[in-house]
């Protein structure tokens, strides 16, 4: 699905729309106990994915209900696999991710 930045007739010439994925991943009830020992590995991986351009933005909601990420990927399945591979998922910090296509405004 990620087609890269697109030019559309109704979009100004100095703006492009990039299709990416907005991902919401709820924290489990056990997350406060499990998260600290996994956090270093998780943050190291997220930082690497940001440097590689796969993850655009990532962070947790202040009320500790979920994490929100913007991810570049071709398909929803690819996004969900990326989340499944994270230590927060295998370690019981995250569960039940959802991914939706998202039009990101990119100035040229």
What are the functions of these language-model segments?
Residues 1-108:
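Conserved, structured core segments of small domains
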């Amino acid at each position: 699905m990620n087609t890269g930045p697109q030019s559309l007739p109704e979009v100004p010439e100095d703006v492009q729309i990039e299709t990416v994925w907005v991902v919401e991943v709820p924290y489990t009830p056990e997350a406060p106990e499990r998260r600290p020992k996994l956090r270093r590995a998780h943050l190291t991986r997220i930082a690497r994915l940001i440097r590689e351009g796969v993850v655009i933005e990532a962070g947790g909601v202040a009320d500790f209900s979920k994490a929100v990420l913007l991810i570049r990927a071709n398909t929803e399945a690819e996004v969900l696999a990326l989340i499944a591979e994270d230590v927060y998922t295998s370690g019981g910090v995250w569960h039940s991710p959802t991914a939706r296509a998202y039009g990101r405004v990119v100035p040229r």
